[in-house]
Amino acid sequence: DMQFEELLDFNTVFLEKHELYKEIKGDETLKSKALLEILGATTGKSLIYAGTYSHIEKVSNLLIENLPVSTKPLLVNFAKWLTINYDDNWQLTNLAKRGTGIHNGQLHRSLSQIQIKLFEEVDVFDNIVSTSSIIEGVNTSAENVIVWRNRNGKSKLNDFTYKNIIGRGGRMFKHFIGKIYLLEEPPQNAPMQLDIPFPDEILGDIDEDKYKESLTKDQVAKIVAFKKDMEQILGKESYDKLLKGNVFQNSNSDFIRSMAIEMKENQEEWNGLAFLNSDDINKWDRLLYKIIVLQPGNWDIEYSKFVAFIKILSQNWIKTIPELLEELDDFEIDIDKFFNLE
C-alpha cells in the first residue's frame, strides 16, 4: 500500500473556487447557462471537465450552438485539415472552428497531442473539453478549470481524481491564481490511501513467484490452477513454448482457458485460422464470428457490423480515413463509432 503525507505546507498557485452548483441545484438549463457565462466573462484558457463521453458530446453541442466561428488563420487551417483527413461533419471539426478542442481516451494519440499543443499556444485554442484522460500522462494546465460533471465514467468522481483535475488550474510563473468553477457538487474531502491490487482478469500473464508479495493467497492459487489447466489442455511443452514466444496477447486467464478448451474440443471448427491472413477479406467471416462469440456482450455493436468494421479497417494501410468512413456508412458507423470500435 502507498500512503501520501503532506510534507510542505504551502501552495505555489492559489485556487479560487466558485461553488456555482449551490445555485444551479441540478438544473441542466442553469448549468448550461452558467458555462456559457463563464466562458464569456473569463480571460485565459479554460479546461472543461465533462467526465463522460456522452457529456463531452453534450458540452460540445452547447458550444457549437453558442460560440462564434473564429477567423484565426491557424484555427481555419486546422479545421480544414480535419475536414480533409477525418470528417467535415465531425463534432471536433466544428469545435475547432470555435477555438475548442476535445481530449479523451479514444482519439488517435497524435490528434490529442496536436490539440494539447494548440491549447498551450497563446492565441489558438481557448478551451478544451475532456474526460479524466487529461490528467493521465498529460502535462497541461489552464487558468480556468470548469467541473461540468462530478463523474469519472460511470463512477462518482473520487477526491483524489477531483484534486488532480482542479490542480490543473493556474500555473507557476504564468498565472498564480487558478479559477475553479464547480457546476456540480465535488466529492467529500477524504484521506487518501492508494491501494493498487492486481485484478483477477490479468492473472494469466503474471509470474506468481516474482510478484508473490503483491498477490493474495487466493490469487496465487488461481495462477497455479490456471497453469495446470493449460498444461493439461495443451501439454506442458507446448504451453511453455507459447509463453516464451509471447503468443498470448490477452492476459485474461478465464478467456485464454475457455479459448484453449474450445479449440481443443472442436478442432475441426477451428481449422482454417490461416484464412485470417488471406487478402480476400470475405474469407474472414466465419472465424471472426467464432472469435467474437468467445466474449459475448463486449462489443457495443451488432456482431455483423463489428465484422464489417474489422474487414474494412484492414484496408487502413491503403485508404484514407474518409474513404474508410464512406464504406462504413453503409453499416451506420460514423466517425465517433469508428474511434470507439478501433
Language-model segments: residues:
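Conserved segment of the helicase C-terminal RecA-like domain
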Residues: 144, 151-199
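Short hydrophobic alpha-helical runs that function as membrane-insertion/retention elements
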Residues: 129, 146-147
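Conserved C-terminal RecA-like helicase domain
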Residues: 9, 15, 22-127, 142, ...
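Conserved helicase ATPase motor motifs in RecA-like P-loop NTPase domains
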Residues: 1-4, 51
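The feature captures the C-terminal accessory region of ATP-dependent helicases
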Residues: 8-9, 27-33, 54, 58-64, ...
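Ser/Thr-glycine-rich phosphate-binding loops at phosphate-binding pockets of nucleotides
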Residues: 1-2, 128-134
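A broadly tuned preference for mixed-charge, low-complexity surface segments
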Residues: 89-109, 177-198, 235-250
